[in-house]
């Protein structure tokens, strides 16, 4: 007899529900959120399980890989789709969610999410940690600027040379702020040191990967953006066409159509926020800093004059994502093109 299993995963315990082909509940219970414990329970209560489903979440990637290694037919369900189905239930509880997931898995009304490989997940963790250090360093610098401004010491936004050296030059040895700022600068120094170590690891990863090096041939795309794209997409063949990458990364506008109304709104901002941010930065660098002519830059410049800088950057970021996917799948590098004669 074929069974379908729904797992509602939480940090300590996982609610489990097993149903048969007709939707009849065969078992409901809980088990520790441990792959071994869950596998033993499933083998006992659902030995002929055809599919085992759970939602995307913080533990989903780890649990999916571990249960796959054990040989279980697990699927990871898009949490947004699952929420839309589960929210119609009157009572919200872990057993009810597990029951709803089991029913979704049985009837097939779900969208399966592709789980990143272990290698891509590790690189993703490295990039997230680096981004956090960059954010902390920026927050520390802004806090120091704010403290200096309160006593009339204006610190320029753009500086040359080490930040800590410039701050120390502004403060006299006996200034009341010097011991206060010193603590922040000490933390800033440590954060900067750790960020440099992460940067070195990022460069080493990019240098060792031929695909990442080719992605870096696109103007505006540096080491971090190329590596983030490489390990966020993970497998380019899962996209039917390069055009769908923009939608996957939340760079396409939402559409609302009902009756006589039909209009496009702002971009959806679904997908990976970190990579989307890096693509925006790449678009900005291409439009404002890259000196060499390219067909992409010329197109973006014309678009910027017509719709404004903000919308143009979104369009260029989306175009860069499409180009990166094409470069990856075709095994080519960026084609700068040739200026057309007037």
Label every model-predicted segment:
Residues 1-342:
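A detector of single, family-specific signature residues
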């Amino acid at each position: 007899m074929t069974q379908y299993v729904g797992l509602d995963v939480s940090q300590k315990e996982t609610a489990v529900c097993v149903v048969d082909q007709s939707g009849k509940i065969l078992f409901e219970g809980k088990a520790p959120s441990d792959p071994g414990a869950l596998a033993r329970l499933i083998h006992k209560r659902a030995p002929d399980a055809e599919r085992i489903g759970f939602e995307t979440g913080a533990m989903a990637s780890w649990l999916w890989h571990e249960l796959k290694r054990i040989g279980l037919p697990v699927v990871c369900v898009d949490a947004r789709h699952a929420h839309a189905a589960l929210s119609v239930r009157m009572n919200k509880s872990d057993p009810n969610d597990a029951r709803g997931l089991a029913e979704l898995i049985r009837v097939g009304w779900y969208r399966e999410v592709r789980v990143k490989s272990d290698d891509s997940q590790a690189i993703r963790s490295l990039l997230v940690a680096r981004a956090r250090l960059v954010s902390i360093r920026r927050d520390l610098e802004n806090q120091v600027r704010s403290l200096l401004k309160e006593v009339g010491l204006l610190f320029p936004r753009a500086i040359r040379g080490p930040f800590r050296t410039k701050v120390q030059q502004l403060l006299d040895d006996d200034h009341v702020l010097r011991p206060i700022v010193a603590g922040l600068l000490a933390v800033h120094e440590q954060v900067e040191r750790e960020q440099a170590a992460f940067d070195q690891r990022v460069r080493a990863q990019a240098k060792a990967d031929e695909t990442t090096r080719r992605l870096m041939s696109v103007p505006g795309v540096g080491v971090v953006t190329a590596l983030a794209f490489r390990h966020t997409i993970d497998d380019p063949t899962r996209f039917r066409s390069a055009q769908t990458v923009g939608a996957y990364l939340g760079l396409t506008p939402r559409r609302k159509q009902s009756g006589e109304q039909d209009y496009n709104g702002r971009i959806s901002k679904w997908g990976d926020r970190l990579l989307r941010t890096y693509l925006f930065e790449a678009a900005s660098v291409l439009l404002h800093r890259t000196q060499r002519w390219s067909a992409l830059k010329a197109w973006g410049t014309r678009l910027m004059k017509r719709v404004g800088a903000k919308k143009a950057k979104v369009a260029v970021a989306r175009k860069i994502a499409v180009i990166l996917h094409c470069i990856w799948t075709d095994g080519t590098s960026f084609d700068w093109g040739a200026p057309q004669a007037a």
